[in-house]
């Protein structure tokens, strides 16, 4: 994104936004208390989302909500009222359609007497930008907070044959694996078809696979998925094309 000319100013608090003839002036203060103004053409404000539970009259029937107006549920997605279940954006967790879909399946299985569950560690997140961004599992920051020792495998699309063939080589695949067991703990991708490639790593994590398991799986050539294999090889410094 920086290569595309986008500048990032982290930890800046917006104090005011004023319209002017050519656009807007944004007045900010950073964490050191220094003030800085930015002149811009357009202002896009992204403040997140909240559960759309207003108007459902949940309080009237006694459904319990948390401090953010999300419906409280147990591990089976059951509310405090036995025959009422809740899933998706109105409960705790990422507001993603595929997360809600898996929860819906789990609820149906539980109602049918089966043992439905959702593994939240393997729910991928995708940002549909150019280049595409995808992630799953833990980040390095989270692993450090958990005092989990880990290994990193990283491979650039610059060395991927398919990416070079279509002249789309921006980005990389990064895999995080447990330092002792080699179990895949997370992955982060930036580049072509990242949202598609993340599924392979999700399957690996769902079945407790190691980076070695991915590395020993034959990937067709030339494909973008070879970058995943190479990143897995790179965990033990065995990448072939980097």
Residue ranges, per PLM feature:
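Conserved beta-strand segments of alpha/beta enzyme cores
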Residues: 7, 64, 149-151
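Short gly/ser/thr-rich secondary-structure transition/capping motifs
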Residues: 23-29, 63-72, 158
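Rossmann-like dinucleotide-binding cores of NAD(P)H-dependent redox enzymes
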Residues: 1-29, 33-34, 93-101, 109-142
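Flexible, glycine-rich terminal cap/loop adjacent to redox cofactors
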Residues: 129-139, 144-242
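Short, surface-exposed charged micro-motifs
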Residues: 16, 62, 76, 174-176
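FAD-site-proximal beta/loop scaffold in flavoenzymes
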Residues: 37-112, 117
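Short acidic-glycine loop/turn motifs at beta-strand connectors
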Residues: 20-21, 67, 179-181
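Residue-level structural signal for beta-strand termini and adjacent loop
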Residues: 20, 85, 112, 189-190
């Amino acid at each position: 994104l920086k290569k595309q000319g986008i500048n990032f100013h982290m930890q800046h608090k917006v104090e005011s936004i004023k319209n002017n003839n050519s656009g807007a002036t944004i007045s900010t203060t950073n964490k050191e208390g220094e003030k800085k103004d930015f002149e811009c053409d357009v202002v896009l404000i992204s403040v997140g989302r909240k559960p759309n539970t207003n108007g459902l009259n949940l309080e009237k029937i006694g459904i319990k909500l948390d401090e953010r107006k999300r419906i409280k549920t147990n591990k089976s997605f059951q509310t405090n009222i036995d025959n009422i279940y809740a899933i998706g954006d109105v409960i705790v967790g990422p507001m993603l359609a595929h997360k809600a879909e898996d929860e819906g399946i789990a609820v149906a299985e539980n109602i049918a007497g089966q043992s439905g569950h959702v593994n939240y560690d393997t729910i991928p997140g995708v940002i549909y930008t150019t280049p595409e961004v995808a992630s799953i599992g833990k980040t390095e920051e989270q692993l450090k907070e958990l005092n989990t020792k880990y290994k990193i495998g990283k491979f650039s699309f610059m060395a991927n044959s398919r990416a070079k063939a279509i002249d789309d080589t921006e980005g990389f695949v990064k895999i995080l694996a447990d330092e002792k067991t080699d179990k895949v703990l997370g992955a982060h991708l930036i580049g072509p078809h990242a949202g598609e490639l993340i599924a392979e790593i999700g399957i690996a994590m769902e079945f407790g696979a190691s980076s070695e398991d991915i590395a020993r799986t034959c990937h067709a050539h030339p494909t973008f998925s070879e970058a995943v294999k190479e990143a897995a090889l790179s965990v033990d410094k065995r990448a072939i094309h980097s």
